[in-house]
Amino acid sequence: MAKGQTNAIIGGGEGIPTSVCTNIVVKAGNGQATLTWTDPPASETVHGVDIVWKSTSVRYKANSAPTSATDGTLAVTEMTRNQYSSNALTITGLTNGTTYYISVYPKSESGAVNADATQIVSVKPSDYSTWTVNIDQSNSNPLSCCTYADSATGMTKGSSDWDDIFGYKPCIMKDGVVQGYLNPNDFTKYENGSSAPITDTTYDVMIEFPRRGLSITTSGNIITVKLTNDPDNSNFQYYAHKRGSTQKDYFYLGAYDATGSSSKLGSNSGKTPLTNVSITNFINYAHNRGTGYEIMGFYQWTYVQALYVLKYGNLNSQSAVGMGYVGGSSAQSTGATNSSGMCYGSTSTTSRVKLFGLEDLWGNVYQFICGLYSDSSRNLLTTTDNFGVSTSSSSWEFSVSSGVSSDSGGYMTKAQGTNNGGFVLKVANGSSTTYFSDYACLNASRFPAVGGYWRDGDAAGVFYCFVNYSASDAYSYVGSRLMFL
């Protein structure tokens, strides 16, 4: 019997079925599943007998596979060959949380059915979704290189619908406890309209990011970024929402560049960003705020970058959102965008930018981030806990090769594109209007600062990551951002 044939057949004629259906792909949805497959050839010869494809039936069953082409529930009998090879069949009326087994049965003109077990797939519908953006790094156009897939298919780039999916919210925090949520269009007020203490250094203005799963993978030139609202999916990582072995429902980032002093790092409106402080001391000053406080971490920064590229589908963040304060001469006070909504920007180089409630995510001052170190071989050492400035690999949770053999910098054309490497530089050969459109560098034995500062012009943006600082470097143009995890 030829490969792909089976004794599990029904029907008359010569009793020889077609070959199997291939490329069977099933995807779960909310109370439904979608299925694509490739039918057997229209005609084929097996043992000297001409076999002609007639139809393909799809049957499904809860908790166990259909045992024959008459068992289970009939979803469809396809009479047009390859009708569902690219346009998926949708099976509705399924129960979320129940595993369904779906069998595909091709039938020949003689009536023989191929019931080979390789044509069985399983799926568990749920009310969780997966949103995907594919980044083609061989396409220099920062907008057209990003295409949507899965639940993102058909969504509009830049739409506010994405904000509902991400679920982030501005809030007032004190000692690690949310005191209340802010009006997203006016940070000076709580949701109920009462005044919020955004200038009071006893409190901090933070942005709350609820738990979502993230996956960043690369195949060839394609970086695939996936986000799910499933809080526990083994196909995703939750590094931004964990501290060591402890899983977190939320992480919080300062709405502003970090303010305060050596007594306590803060996040308040109407203040001058704290600068001229080393990454070592910034981490210490955050710790002085209390248990759970840090400066923004690498995995949280990566998470925000992923949300950006999902929402805007454009690698040029200064074009998609705004230039940011990149044409000035000194650091500007916080709170300029309090009444500018959650995402704001303009073409002016002396205006401010705001992404997901985070003012000056690029421009104004650089932000040191913790949780990432490039060692002497440019391996990327990362962690979700015990943030510090140790240069010993044993002090870090993960170590991955960057693939970068010498110190490198320039406009980024290729990123690491992995769960542990995020969007750190891999190849720099672009410009301010092509590929990732931001400047980046990766040097040995260095810590990172991100975003860009007041004189960076079109080099700044959400993918600006400058891994070029020692543990003791301190400059007037480098600050940080508070985090609670």
Give the residues covered by each predicted segment.
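Short S/T/G- and acidic-enriched coil/turn segments that sit immediately N-terminal to beta-strands
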Residues: Y84-T90
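Pro/Thr/Ser/Gly-rich low-complexity, intrinsically disordered linker/stalk tracts
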Residues: I10-V52, N96, A112-D127
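C-terminal, surface-exposed recognition/capping segments
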Residues: W131-V133, Y299-T302, M323-N338, Y344-G345, ...
